[in-house]
């Protein structure tokens, strides 16, 4: 009886390696697609909200936030909607870099930490300007309106520049060493880092094109371009081979146990 039960159990047991490979393939598609959706939402939100520049006058800031209140809030909402998609992509990127880097995973950890820190800095900088727009900029003291706009600009440009550079440089090094993705992504990453350095230098400027690290908005645009290229190349590349599970031998072991 036990022998017959063991034989049936061994026959019914699914090939876990096959199901694991299918799950990995689905995850390989979902991660990059989520990244592209997140970047699309963030870009659309930025273009819709059109937050005032650092060199704008206080009157211009109040006028834009008050007159285009619904448009600004819609854009800000899209920027926050992007976060769950980008976090999903980050979980995929962590797995990709951890497999490519090997046992140490120092750069994979740095990538995850810098991306999360970048999200926190940008989101925190948008909270105050969101509150001002929601309340109505015309009823908020002008000094507070300007303070909120300046915080959003600083968080988006100069203050987030160091972690933005780390979020690109760390995965670029792994990609260059492992060739997990095309190496030209690393070269593109160096251009992004150069833009981040210019953003950080703008922290010491209160006037001109690079005030508060604005630099005509080139820094965030380059980061989005690099992240989009990363998502597209990851989606186009085949999923990395999953390790064969040791549980595939469980069927024969159960069969032998039943016979004995």
Regions found by a protein language model. Give the residues of each.
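Hydrophobic, aromatic-enriched alpha-helical segments typical of multi-pass transmembrane helices
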Residues: 2-260
């Amino acid at each position: 009886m036990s022998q017959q039960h063991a034989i049936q159990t061994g026959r019914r047991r699914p090939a876990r390696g096959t199901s694991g490979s299918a799950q990995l393939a689905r995850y390989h598609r979902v991660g990059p697609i989520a990244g592209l959706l997140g970047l699309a939402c963030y870009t659309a939100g930025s273009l819709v909200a059109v937050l005032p520049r650092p060199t704008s006058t206080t009157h211009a800031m109040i006028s834009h936030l008050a007159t285009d209140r619904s448009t600004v809030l819609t854009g800000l909402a899209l920027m926050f909607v992007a976060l769950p998609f980008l976090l999903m992509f980050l979980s995929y990127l962590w797995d990709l870099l951890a497999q490519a880097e090997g046992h140490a995973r120092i750069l994979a950890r740095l990538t995850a930490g810098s991306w999360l820190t970048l999200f926190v800095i940008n989101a925190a900088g948008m909270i105050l300007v969101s509150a001002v727009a929601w309340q109505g900029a015309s009823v908020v003291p002008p000094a507070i309106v300007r303070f909120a706009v300046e915080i959003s600009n600083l968080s988006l440009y100069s203050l987030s520049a160091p972690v933005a550079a780390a979020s690109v440089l760390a995965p670029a090094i792994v990609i260059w060493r492992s060739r997990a993705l095309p190496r030209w992504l690393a070269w593109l990453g160096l251009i992004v880092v150069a833009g981040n350095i210019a953003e950080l230098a703008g922290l010491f400027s209160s006037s001109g094109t690079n005030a508060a690290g604005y630099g005509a908005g080139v820094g965030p645009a380059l980061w989005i371009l690099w992240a989009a290229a990363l998502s597209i190349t990851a989606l186009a590349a085949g999923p990395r081979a999953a390790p064969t599970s040791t549980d595939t031998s469980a069927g024969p072991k159960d069969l032998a146990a039943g016979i004995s």
